[in-house]
Curated annotation (Swiss-Prot):
GO terms for cellular component: chloroplast. It is found in: Plastid, Chloroplast. The lineage of its organism: Eukaryota, Viridiplantae, Streptophyta, Embryophyta, Tracheophyta. The basic functional RuBisCO is composed of a large chain homodimer in a 'head-to-tail' conformation. In form I RuBisCO this homodimer is arranged in a barrel-like tetramer with the small subunits forming a tetrameric 'cap' on each end of the 'barrel'. Residues 1-56 form a transit peptide. This is Ribulose bisphosphate carboxylase small subunit, chloroplastic. Its main location: plastid. It comes from Capsicum annuum. GO terms for molecular function: ribulose-bisphosphate carboxylase activity. Heterohexadecamer of 8 large and 8 small subunits.
């Protein structure tokens, strides 16, 4: 019986030696000298992590009588040439242009939904049908002009709809009523 116990211990010791050689021992951290050191040479104000130097040139959006419309709506109104470029972009992407208008609330407000952000439960009225098969940006711009004549006091936006993924991919204001045109710089 003693011989059987010894042989088991000998086998176990041999297995432990094999396992120990399979796992490398921890040698500590590598020295910092092996890593390359890169430092910025010029230390101008744009390389500082804080934006403290740029605070003086920033403007705050005035919350009184300044409504939030769509993405980038704080920019000046788009000219016809700029609208054509935006429309050409959505046509190049293969999206279907569609016009929508709103006669009462062209801005974000909370009527049916309480979550923050753009999705507030409001719906715009579609102008005619989506322009399936449209390949000319001037056709879309002509529809914007027609909508302006029919509803001069309405907000008009152009959306680009991807009919494969069935999602709205782009949306921007094409026209704001005269009473709401303002500049954030004329406070």
């Amino acid at each position: 019986m003693a011989s059987s116990v010894m042989s088991t211990a000998t086998v176990a010791t041999g297995a432990n030696a094999a396992q120990a050689s399979m796992i490398a021992s921890f040698n500590g951290l590598k020295s910092a000298a092996s890593f390359p050191v890169t430092r910025k040479q010029d230390l101008d104000i744009t390389s500082i992590a804080s934006n403290g130097g740029r605070v003086e040139c920033m403007l705050v959006w005035p919350p009184i009588n300044k409504k939030k419309y769509e993405t980038l709506s704080y920019l000046p109104d788009l000219s016809d040439e700029q609208l054509l470029k935006e429309i050409e972009y959505l046509l190049q992407k293969g999206w279907v242009p569609c016009l929508e208008f709103e006669t009462e609330h062209g801005f974000v407000y909370r009527e049916h939904h309480r979550s923050p952000g753009y999705y507030d439960g409001r719906y715009w009225t579609m102008w005619k049908l989506p322009m399936f098969g449209c390949t000319d940006a001037t056709q879309v711009l002509n529809e914007v002009q027609e909508a302006k004549k029919a509803y001069p006091q309405a907000w008009i936006r152009i959306i680009g709809f991807d009919n494969v993924r069935q999602v709205q991919c782009i949306s921007f204001i094409a026209y704001k009523p005269e009473a709401t045109k303002f500049s954030m710089f004329n406070v």
